[in-house]
Swiss-Prot record:
Protein name: Millepora cytotoxin-1
Location(s) in or outside the cell: Secreted; Nematocyst
Signal sequence residues: 1-20
Swiss-Prot/TrEMBL Sequence repeat ranges: 100-109, 153-162, 206-215
Length: 222
């Protein structure tokens, strides 16, 4: 008996898929936070607030704004994690918004600060001494007639904390009038504070927590 072996060629089809080069990461978390406010038209923070910044709703980020007219995109960070920074508003401008994002890997915050025209003739500007020690509390206010126009900070990896200096600028013919503190922000949470219409940022309080290795902040607006 003759056995025939039939060799059938096997065709292998190799499909090569061309992949486009990955797009650069342009995600900006500050823009994401700001877009929430713009879309939902809300005031953010704790429902229990009893000041001119009373919140109507929560979004879980302790993200707050002053008034709808003041809503603005917080555009870019002013520091890298673990790195020092110094920020000053341009001459004749004051703080329009101040925002921050916390990172649990670095145990540090990135800050964003935006400015607006002061509407007053500006006099002398001075930097404060450091307003806090590492792991210590902060309770700072500019002198009467002056408003916050800058922030400087250094970070320490041993304490996983920052020390802060604030710059105050004198506004000619401006007096404080009515003032109000915001409520504290939340440890490990992002926040954006927008200066209410007709007000200025004049003070800041802060407390550090070693469990969270983070600070919570409250702002004084007049």
């Amino acid at each position: 008996m003759v056995t025939l072996y039939l060799h059938v060629p096997i065709l292998l089809l190799v499909v090569i898929t061309a992949r486009a080069a990955p797009k650069p990461d342009t995600h900006n978390p500050f823009d994401e936070l700001s877009s929430v406010a713009e879309k939902q038209d809300l005031h953010y923070g704790d429902r229990s607030r009893k000041d001119p910044f009373i919140a109507q709703n929560d979004v879980g980020n302790n993200f707050r704004d002053g008034t709808q007219e003041n809503l603005t995109k917080v555009r870019s960070k002013v520091n890298q994690y673990d790195q020092p920074f110094t920020f000053k508003c341009p001459l004749g401008e004051t703080i329009k918004s101040i925002g921050s994002i916390h990172d649990n890997h670095y145990e540090d915050r990135q800050w964003d600060i935006d400015c607006k025209p002061a509407g007053y003739t500006m006099g002398i500007s001075t930097w404060s001494p450091y307003a806090n020690d590492y792991d210590g509390s902060m309770n700072f206010e500019c002198n009467e007639g002056s408003v916050v126009t800058g922030m400087s900070s250094i970070h320490d990896n041993y304490y996983e904390d920052r020390r802060y200096q604030l710059m105050c600028s004198y506004l000619n013919n401006w007096k404080r009038g009515s003032c109000a503190w915001t409520s504290y922000t939340t440890y490990d949470a992002s926040f954006v504070e927008l200066t209410p219409t007709g007000k200025f940022l004049v003070g800041m309080k802060s407390q550090h927590n070693n469990y969270y290795e983070d600070r919570k902040f409250k702002m004084l607006y007049c």
